[in-house]
């Protein structure tokens, strides 16, 4: 395969329909929030979704894996390109089950949840980006 087959209108048309990477609730939201430790405002580029350690993490939509490796601050990290400058980012993975350069379908397993995360509980970190700019992932996930 050499291309991603998204609906007409591309990834933009998928807003509000993306597969949740894991079953769980959002425990850290996108945007500016007060840091509980340092009591200062911090901007979060993504969300944390709580999940059981070793739970399967799924691709939110079809695309090409462009990064699948350790990344400081995110543990094991997978980045999927969906074309037109759109990417999804999956961090705090305990294991990665895909390789860079492969194409994945929405709902396909790409890894597992790590035993811990930088928020003190097992959770997957998830971002949606457009041309490098973070977007609110909660607006993109299936409601």
Where in the sequence are the language-model features?
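Extracytoplasmic/periplasmic cell wall- or extracellular glycan-interacting regions that localize
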Residues: 1-75, 79-81, 134-143
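Short beta-alpha junctions and helix-cap segments that line functional grooves
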Residues: 11-13, 36, 92-93, 113-114, ...
């Amino acid at each position: 395969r050499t291309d991603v087959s998204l609906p007409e209108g591309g990834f933009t048309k998928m807003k509000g329909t993306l597969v949740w990477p894991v079953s769980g609730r959002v425990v850290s939201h996108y945007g500016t929030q007060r840091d509980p430790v340092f009591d200062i405002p911090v901007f979060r580029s993504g969300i944390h979704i709580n999940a059981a350690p070793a739970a399967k993490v799924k691709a939110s939509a079809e695309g090409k894996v462009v990064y699948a490796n350790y990344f400081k601050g995110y543990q094991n990290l997978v980045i999927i390109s969906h074309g037109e400058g759109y990417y999804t980012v999956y961090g705090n993975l305990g294991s990665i089950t895909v390789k860079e350069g492969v194409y994945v379908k929405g709902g396909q397993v790409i890894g597992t949840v790590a035993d811990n995360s930088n928020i003190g509980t097992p959770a997957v970190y998830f971002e949606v980006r457009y041309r490098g700019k973070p977007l609110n992932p909660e607006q993109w996930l299936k409601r």
